[in-house]
Amino acid sequence: MNKAQKEVQQAQLDEEKKVIRLLEVVYERAKKDCEQKIMELSARTDLENLQSIVYQKEYQQMMVDQLEAMLYDLHEGQFTTIADYLEQSYINGYVGMFYDLQSTGIPLVIPIQQDQVVKALKTNSKLSSGLYTKLGEDVGYLKRSIRAELSRGIASGSTWNEMALRIAKGMNSPFRKAYNNAIRIARTEGHRIQNEAALDGQHGAKKKGADIVKQ
């Protein structure tokens, strides 16, 4: 790996660190909102002495319904964050390839073709159901996990505050699993897109007569 290639790789690593920090902010906000919402609902005096299982189930549903907006914001936030990162990964890979060429004495630059970006980000995606839908699966998992944790908490006699803390901050928190999966998707797709962008650039350079040596 030559100096130019190392610089390009470092730029991509910096972008990866940035998206991980942004995802952490998105998830921390969601966890805090979740914890606060459960604690607010638990403070309602008309729901202090729930005895009936039916009422408990209704309360669980009320909790989950109240968290719908928070989960929607989480879905939208992580999708936007990762989508922006993947587009930047394409730019890094494409521009980086020509930067590498210039470092070897070939002063060639070809503008990025938007249809190639769309193809790399969507058509050639390795995700089975698309980025938005794939991330939505984790949000759906979060919703089911929150409901299950509320059921376990009621059965074991936990307080609502204890349940809120387990859901938001426990080592096995559903938020942690979804967060880790979002990072995995960003990393694997970002790497694939960067490589595909470099190949697109190489094909374009070859058409212009550049002698490309396979890296």
Whereabouts are the PLM-identified features?
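N-terminal leader/targeting and assembly helices and adjacent pre-domain segments
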Residues: 1-176
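Acidic, glycine-rich two-metal-ion catalytic cores of nucleic acid-processing enzymes
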Residues: 164, 175-215
